[in-house]
Structure formats: C-alpha cells, structure tokens
Amino acid sequence: MVALHLVRHGQASFGADDYDRLSALGVAQGRVVGQQLGARLGAADIAVVSGSLNRHRDTAAACLEAMGRGGTALSIDPDLNEYDPADVVACHRPDLADAAALRAELATAPDPRRAYQALFAEAVARWMGGQHDADYAECWPVFRNRVLAGLARAAQRGNTVLVFTSGGPIMVAVQAVLGLDDAGARQVHWALVNGGVTKLLASSRAVGRVGAGWSLSSLNEQAGLDGPDGLLTYR
C-alpha cells in the first residue's frame, strides 16, 4: 500500500506583482504542517515530490525543516504545477487580462478578496465547461491528464510520499479517486486551505494510474492551522 500526502502550498503573495512567493504566514503554515507530519510519520522512510513553482518548493523546504529532514532529496515534477489562473481569468474576462486592470476592478469592490473569488469561480467554471477549450493555453482536459500522470509517477517513488502542490492538482486527484463530476470537484477546490493535507492510498498494483484501487483516506486536514493563531487561510 502506498500513501500519498498531498500538501497544498502555504499562503502566497495575493495581490502582489509576484504571486509565486510565500508570505510570512505561508512560511509559518509550512512549518506547522511539518510539525504535524513529523509527529505522524516519525522516522519512516519518505519520498518527497514537488511542483516546480516557488510556492511549492518553499513550502516543502519549510515543512521538511520542521520535520527535522532538511536534507531530504526533493524531486521536482512540473506536471504537479497549478493551472495558470491569469489565463483562466483573461479568457473569461478579456478586459481584465492586464494585471493592472484586474487590480483596478477589484479596488472598487467593498471586499476585493470576495470579489476576486466570485470572478475566479466563474472563470474556472467556464474553463472546465468544455465549450471553450480552444481559448486556453492549457484547457481543462489537458491539465487534468498531466496532473494525473504526475501523481501516478509520484506514487511509484515509495510507500510514503509527500507531494507539495496546489489546489487544482489536489482537486483533480480527489475527483479521480471519488468519481466526482466537475461541479463537485470545484466544491472541493474552493474548500482547500493553505497547508491542508489530503491523504490518498493506492494498492501496489494500482500505483501506475490514479483511479481504481485508490481511496481517499483524509481530505484537507488542517490540524494546527485551525486555531487562534490566524494560520487558516484559503488564498
């Protein structure tokens, strides 16, 4: 039996010119996740895989340091990267393709974060809908297939594998294991917290393909994050 612990990255720099950089809170979230995983896994042999984005690698570094495993080899797999949110939004609202235009639009809202989430939810629904696949640099079926390929490779790296990735790939994994439709998958996506851990189990005979022979052991674990310290974030 193979156990994959899918870790969503810590909080990135929402609203900044460079989103792909952990905030100070995101680093703290990575450390808390490391403390929790360290207590759970003890001295067990682990393999560690990460997407290639800075927020993935930096979350992995903070987590592994807190586990006392700072020297652990990190395998990088770009197939575990997130979809391009800027492209998804721009295809839905071409008038907001420029980052400055998007910031100006959100600045007029009473709650910019809530306004962005509403806009983003509409954009992702369009992206996943299958009616406009040719519009996107990476359409939903292509994204889903590359993520599933990356997860299948990760599952072949050992019996206990930590995977540092984003909400989109975790959504894909849960959808494949539970057989959710796209609307149900999006509900999972929006519930995922920064630093949340989702655990999948795969029989040794099923590791080469995500789906049959896989099961969901836990979803969006947030022990240590959901408390009075303000560590629980969604974006």
Pin down the residues of each PLM region.
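Generic beta-sheet signal
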Residues: 4, 46, 159-165
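Active-site catalytic microenvironments for nucleophilic, acid-base chemistry
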Residues: 36, 40, 62-66, 153, ...
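Short beta-strand scaffold positions
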Residues: 50-51, 145, 164-165
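Acidic, low-complexity terminal tails and accessory targeting/binding regions
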Residues: 69, 82-111, 141, 157-160, ...
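Extended, charge-rich helix/loop segments that form flexible
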Residues: 97-134
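A mid-sequence, solvent-exposed acidic-amphipathic segment
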Residues: 130-161
